[in-house]
Swiss-Prot record:
The gene is cls1. Its EC number is 2.7.8.-. This is Cardiolipin synthase 1. It comes from Bacillus cereus (strain ATCC 14579 / DSM 31 / CCUG 7414 / JCM 2152 / NBRC 15305 / NCIMB 9373 / NCTC 2599 / NRRL B-3711). PANTHER family: CARDIOLIPIN SYNTHASE, CARDIOLIPIN SYNTHASE YWIE-RELATED. It catalyses: 2 a 1,2-diacyl-sn-glycero-3-phospho-(1'-sn-glycerol) = a cardiolipin + glycerol. One of its GO terms (molecular function) is cardiolipin synthase activity. NCBIfam families: bac_cardiolipin, PRK12452.1. SMART domains: PLDc. It is a multi-pass membrane protein. It is an enzyme of class 2 (transferase).
Length: 509
């Protein structure tokens, strides 16, 4: 089943024809429709079986198809993984990895580490590069941006300073007050002669309308939608979304992290008057990788719409090689997605957390780890490492919230500490290890970020920003409630059943 939604539409078309032709025979119609549904369910089950998914995901799909067949088929049409699209993404990966290697080959001497790092950090940079991450870059400065006010102020300031190009990419971009403010800043720079490229995800930014985008097009801004959910086939599966958030100005200043563009990310919503998030500003050599990732996504999403090629971007205007001579530490940027089987971000997080000797602190809005991640955290806690997980006390997803809590029992019993952020919504995606190494980016601690979404994280080694991250953690803990095992185990049977059910269906979504 290359396109599940197409098969469903064909099925319902056939059923409609049969309803018209066989309206005199209720029994025949009932038998025919029943047989048709049975064949569909068996076919979907076979596809799921041969895809070699995780046992949890396979079991979840089988149970839903068996117990709720109609709902199960509809869910598969929307959330099922499309093999033809998977192959398309894998083909993209191979081509673009080769091109990125060419970029790095031309900058090999520039990318050699010159700042001394400790032995563990050096080892991690080498391991992560084998996982598919870019080379670690020194002569790069980073600045932690806490929450939306700091982040959007810095981004707007950088946009205002742009001289050659602005590349902007978001999963969610809303046409509200801050979205309009950023848009108008881009329009002004485009009118000034700056090249502006705007890339947004077809699902996350599905509320963007023509009347909002038209002034951008009229100003000369190039706009591309990443994998539209509506196409000539009416509806695509919603998997394989681009969850990355990237802004690059002149190849010299970059931004990435947890924040999308919208008023709610500034704490302007009634539901979440406080939106706790973290973003990162990057200047220096690490921009090589960030720029390459944006261009990979741009060339993929715009294929067929224009005649761009990598050759047009392989120059100093897009890869200027700006260096910050007095910078400390190093930065390593890692990207992953369905275009690779490497699970680069998941493996990077495992390597970073697995190197811990004293502490592992995690902030994530959704905690639905795979078995390897859960086992590592549990064993680390048993070994006496200070394992802490900070998650939102009030979530924007009941499924993720309840599913997350189903993983708390083995961690609490192992000695880990879990904190529920009580001031608002905790949306930061950060890992801090031993106060010396940290990761910050777009990836949640869940299977969707590890396997299905296009994500990006930055690994920070021995820099001031790592200490700033620790400072934010310590402040966040003050605004959180620690979940104690004695009280947590007293949850009602109804609550435990709900958690288990949400955990069961979470691999589907």
């Amino acid at each position: 089943m290359k396109k599940p939604i197409v098969q469903l539409l064909l099925i319902f078309t056939i059923v409609s024809i049969v309803l018209f032709l066989l309206n005199t025979s209720y029994i025949s119609l009932y038998t025919f429709v029943g047989a048709l549904w049975s064949i569909t369910i068996v076919g979907i089950s076979f596809v799921i079986f041969i895809e070699n998914r995780s046992p949890q995901s396979t079991l979840a799909w089988f149970l839903v198809l068996a117990l709720l067949p109609i709902i199960g088929v509809l869910l598969y049409a929307i959330f099922g993984r499309s093999r033809w699209r998977r192959k398309k993404h894998l083909h993209r990966s191979e081509e673009q990895r080769k091109l990125f290697r060419e970029i790095l080959e031309g900058r090999r001497l520039e990318l050699l580490l010159t700042v001394p790092l400790n032995e563990r950090s050096i080892h991690l940079t080498e391991v992560i590069q084998k996982f598919g991450g870019g080379p670690a870059a020194d002569r790069t400065t980073t600045k932690l941006l806490t929450n939306g006010d700091q982040t959007f102020s810095e981004i707007l300031r950088a946009i205002e300073q742009a001289k050659h190009h602005i590349h902007i990419q978001y999963y969610i971009y809303k046409s509200d007050e801050i979205g309009t403010k950023v848009r108008d800043a881009l329009i002004q720079k485009a009118k000034d002669g700056v090249i502006v490229r705007f890339l947004y995800d077809g699902l996350g930014s599905n509320t963007l309308r023509r009347r909002f985008l038209q002034p951008m097009k009229e100003a000369g801004i190039e706009i591309v939608e990443f994998d539209p959910i509506f196409s000539a086939w009416l509806l695509e599966t919603v998997n394989y979304r681009n969850h990355r958030k990237i802004v690059i100005v002149d190849g010299e200043i970059g931004f990435t992290g947890g924040l999308n563009v919208g008023d709610e990310y500034l704490g302007r919503s009634k539901k979440f008057p406080v939106w706790r998030d973290s973003h990162l500003k990057i200047e220096g050599k690490a921009l090589y990788k960030l720029q390459a990732i944006f261009l990979e996504d741009w060339l993929y999403a715009s294929s067929g719409l224009n005649t761009y090629s990598w050759d047009q971007f392989m120059n100093r205007q897009y890869f200027p090689g700006k260096e910050i001579s007095n910078a400390e530490g190093a930065v390593q940027i890692v990207a992953s997605g369905p275009s690779s089987d490497d699970k680069s971000i998941r493996n990077t997080l495992l390597a970073v957390m697995g190197s811990a000797k004293k502490s592992i602190w995690i902030a994530t809005p959704y905690f639905i780890p795979d078995q390897e991640t859960l086992t590592l955290l549990r064993l680390s806690a048993i070994a006496g490492i200070d394992v802490r997980i900070l998650y939102p006390g009030k979530s924007d997803s009941i499924i993720s919230d309840q599913a997350s809590q189903s993983y708390f029992t083995p961690l609490l019993k192992a000695g880990a500490s879990i904190y529920s952020y009580k001031d608002g919504f905790m949306h930061a995606k950060i890992v801090l290890v031993d106060d010396t190494i940290a990761t910050i980016g777009t990836a949640n601690m869940d299977v969707r970020s590890f396997e299905l979404n296009y994500e990006i994280i930055s690994v920070l080694y021995e820099s001031k920003t790592v200490h700033d991250i620790k400072r934010d953690f310590e402040e966040d803990f003050k605004h959180s409630t620690e979940i104690k095992w004695n009280s947590f185990q007293k949850r009602s049977i109804k609550k435990r059943i709900l958690e288990s059910f949400m955990r069961l269906i979470s691999p589907l979504l």
